[in-house]
A protein has these predicted regions:
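P-loop NTP-binding core
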Residues: 1-280
Length: 280
């Protein structure tokens, strides 16, 4: 959510140009919409409808399921008012997005793997659903569940690049190994052009020997593919959903909040890699 927000907003301070971004939620928890303060009871068709019948139905289009910048901004401002009932002034001007569209998910998506289990081409459903959006956005970011089920496989089949966040914890590298194995399987069988954009260390604690060890092991295996930027373990990041906005929006692009700054630094790195890929 923070990367998508930062890339869509852009920042002169960090040298990031604004891009048109589509953020796709493939996690049945539906946390993407919640992070932007969206009351999921107010949205129309979601990823579940698009996934289950959109490919087979000309009556349902991608744009019917997406939440645009105005809707997201209104939701964030409404959430801000609920979180700050005693303040006479309204939400700050920086509680807003532009050039960002969200394709939300909800718990109904959790049953899609069973529904699609026997369908031909089940691993390409997302790719087909997103085909009409390829020329409308500069960047499409797909947020996946942690499990390596059919939803994640669909994301890998539709994507050009994979970004892997790793918590700086003991079992992190084991889980990453399983994901890398899945990526290679998809490369061999369905999507040979799938590449690794990078690996992001998250939940990092300063002066933690464990965090240092996990980071060193990641760099030993993946070298420059590990981003220099790291996301710290932070109370402000954990509490940002209470404000109904990602932390890069709630704190706006400044260099005073360390958690917000870490995401902007990461977005700067990711933006450069994306630009290099596009130019290549």
């Amino acid at each position: 959510m923070n990367l998508a927000s930062a890339l869509s907003l852009g920042s002169e301070d960090y040298g990031i140009s604004s891009r048109r971004v589509l953020l796709v939620d493939m996690d049945p928890k539906g946390n993407v919409a919640t992070t932007f303060g969206v009351d999921k009871r107010t949205v129309g068709p979601t990823m579940n409808e698009l996934f289950s019948r959109g490919v087979d139905s000309s009556s349902l289009r991608l744009e019917d399921c997406t939440l645009g910048p105005d809707f997201l901004t209104g939701s964030m401002k409404a959430s801000w008012r609920k979180s700050n009932p005693g303040k006479s002034r309204g939400p700050p001007n920086h509680i807003a997005v532009r050039n960002l569209w969200v394709l939300p998910a909800d718990m109904d998506l959790s049953g899609i793997e069973v529904d699609l289990a026997t369908r031909v081409g089940r691993e390409n459903r997302l790719k087909l659903a997103l085909s009409e959006a390829m020329d409308s956005f500069d960047v499409i970011i797909i947020d996946t569940p942690a499990s390596l089920g059919l939803l994640t496989v669909n994301a890998l089949c539709a994507a050009e690049w994979v970004l892997i966040p790793i918590q700086a914890e003991f079992y992190a590298l084991e889980g990453m190994g399983q994901l890398i194995s899945a990526v290679r399987d998809v490369q061999k069988s369905v999507n040979p052009n799938l590449g690794l954009l990078g690996i992001l260390m998250t939940m990092v604690q300063t002066r933690s020997k464990l965090c240092e060890t996990v980071t060193e092991q990641a760099r030993r295996h993946f070298g420059e593919r590990v981003f220099d930027s790291q996301i710290p373990r932070s109370v402000s990041i954990a509490e940002s959903p209470l404000e109904g906005a990602p932390i890069v929006i709630a704190q706006k692009p400044n260099k005073t909040n360390s958690a917000s700054r870490s995401y902007w630094e990461f977005a700067k790195e990711a933006d450069r890699r994306i630009s290099t890929i596009s130019e290549g």
